[in-house]
Amino acid sequence: MGKLYVFDHPLIQHKITYIRDKNTGTKDFRELVDEVASLMAFEITRDLPLEDIEIETPVSKATTKVIAGKKLGLIPILRAGLGMVDGILKLIPAAKVGHVGLYRDPKTLQPVEYYVKLPTDVEERDFIVLDPMLATGGSAAEAINSLKKRGAKQIKLMCIVAAPEGVKVVQEEHPDVDIYVAALDEKLNDHGYVVPGLGDAGDRLFGTK
């Protein structure tokens, strides 16, 4: 079973308060999501391998460490996942960015893939799937399916707020995928929204309804 990591860092929790607040405007909401994604990236990349290299400082020669050639790919689920990309790219500018677009079939209520664009070297990369909200878990599970069908081997899921129901779905369908969240909320309501949640992340990021 994949592990669930819930970040309790004070800076993250402070910023999530304002992400949740319905009075936070689009500009501030967008900046806060960006900042939380950056903070979460520190933890989600903790297991990146390092190797020694020789450099010369202004004072002397030194042996120091760099990331050992690990190739990373960021996969935002359209459209809300886009809000998390830049915050991570600030720390990992060499990461490639793919996209997965899904819509919900009105009859079956199941997610349907309508767009996928990935780096060409899928099998060589570790991927981080990005979505601010993990609600029912259907979209995240289908996005992970899309990656696996195209050869991805190492996948993590990174969300800002998650419902227990969504976590359960992803863990059952993808027991090899670890989930990283900034907050684990109480439940889903009858409309499929996370409670207390943060509303519709896509609308709040892009100022739409």
Curated annotation (Swiss-Prot):
Keywords associated with the record: Allosteric enzyme, Glycosyltransferase, GTP-binding, Magnesium, Nucleotide-binding, Transferase
Keyword Glycoprotein: no
Note on cofactor: Binds 1 Mg(2+) ion per subunit. The magnesium is bound as Mg-PRPP.
EC number(s) per entry: 2.4.2.9
Reactions performed catalytically: UMP + diphosphate = 5-phospho-alpha-D-ribose 1-diphosphate + uracil
Listed GO biological process terms: UMP salvage; uracil salvage
Entry annotated with the keyword Isomerase: no
Description of activity control: Allosterically activated by GTP.
Positions annotated to bind uracil: V194, G199, D200, A201
Biological pathway: Pyrimidine metabolism; UMP biosynthesis via salvage pathway; UMP from uracil: step 1/1
InterPro entries in the record: PRibTrfase_dom, PRTase-like, Upp_B, UPRTase/APRTase, Ura_phspho_trans
Pfam families: UPRTase
GO molecular function, one term: magnesium ion binding
CC cofactor: Mg(2+)
Binding site for 5-phospho-alpha-D-ribose 1-diphosphate: R79, R104, D131, P132, M133, L134, A135, T136, G137, G138, S139, D200
Family statement: Belongs to the UPRTase family.
Main function: Catalyzes the conversion of uracil and 5-phospho-alpha-D-ribose 1-diphosphate (PRPP) to UMP and diphosphate.
Protein name (Swiss-Prot/TrEMBL): Uracil phosphoribosyltransferase
Protein species of origin: Bacillus thuringiensis (strain Al Hakam)
